[in-house]
């Protein structure tokens, strides 16, 4: 698995933990890495990318959540599963604040996170919502 995919997975786990318990970003990331099988061989690029994602989502969370609310049809943020909500946050952060990551990559990676961590409807839900957000943001 590549460094960025690993970083995204750890970022998702850390964001999930930050919603569940009082923890700092560093504590949540450490917990995510410790729980992972490959914790003995942490790729420095994956660690850095995960930290950038979590810190970015946390600092832009209000804006990101507004985009989720605006583009989710008949779903309130608080009714979404924690996994779906945080996958969407990661995807939107990449779409809006990481111009170095192509739209297709951001959406596909978020869909994969939905498949791997969410329920059977997560990937389609994530794909549809992120596509609407990308169009609204004029992300090529």
Curated annotation (Swiss-Prot):
Q: Does the keyword RNA-binding apply?
A: yes
Keyword RNA-binding appears in the UniProt entry: yes
GO CC field: cytosol
In its UniProt record, a GO molecular function of this protein is:
RNA binding
Q: Which InterPro entries match?
A: NusB-like_sf, NusB_fam, NusB_RsmB_TIM44
Q: Name one GO biological process term.
A: transcription antitermination
Entry's SUPFAM superfamilies?
Answer: NusB-like (SSF48013)
What Pfam families would the database entry show? Answer: NusB (PF01029)
**Record key words, sorted:** RNA-binding, Transcription, Transcription antitermination, Transcription regulation
Functional note: Involved in transcription antitermination. Required for transcription of ribosomal RNA (rRNA) genes. Binds specifically to the boxA antiterminator sequence of the ribosomal RNA (rrn) operons.
What NCBIfam families would the database entry show? nusB (TIGR01951)
Concerning its family, UniProt says:
Belongs to the NusB family.
Stated name of the protein = Transcription antitermination protein NusB
Q: Which organism is it from?
A: Myxococcus xanthus (strain DK1622)
Report which gene this protein is encoded by.
nusB
């Amino acid at each position: 698995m590549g460094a960025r995919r690993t970083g995204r997975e750890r970022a998702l786990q850390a964001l999930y933990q930050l919603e569940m318990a009082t923890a700092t970003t560093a504590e949540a990331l450490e917990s995510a890495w410790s729980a992972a099988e490959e914790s003995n061989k942490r790729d420095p690029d994956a660690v850095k990318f995960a930290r950038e994602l979590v810190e970015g989502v946390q600092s832009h969370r209000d804006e990101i959540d507004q985009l989720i609310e605006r583009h989710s049809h008949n779903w309130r943020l608080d009714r979404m599963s924690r996994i779906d909500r945080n996958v969407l946050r990661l995807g939107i952060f990449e779409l809006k604040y990481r111009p170095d990551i192509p739209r297709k990559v951001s959406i596909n990676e978020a869909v994969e996170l939905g498949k791997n961590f969410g329920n059977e409807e997560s990937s389609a839900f994530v794909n549809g919502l992120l596509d609407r957000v990308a169009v609204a943001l004029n992300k090529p």
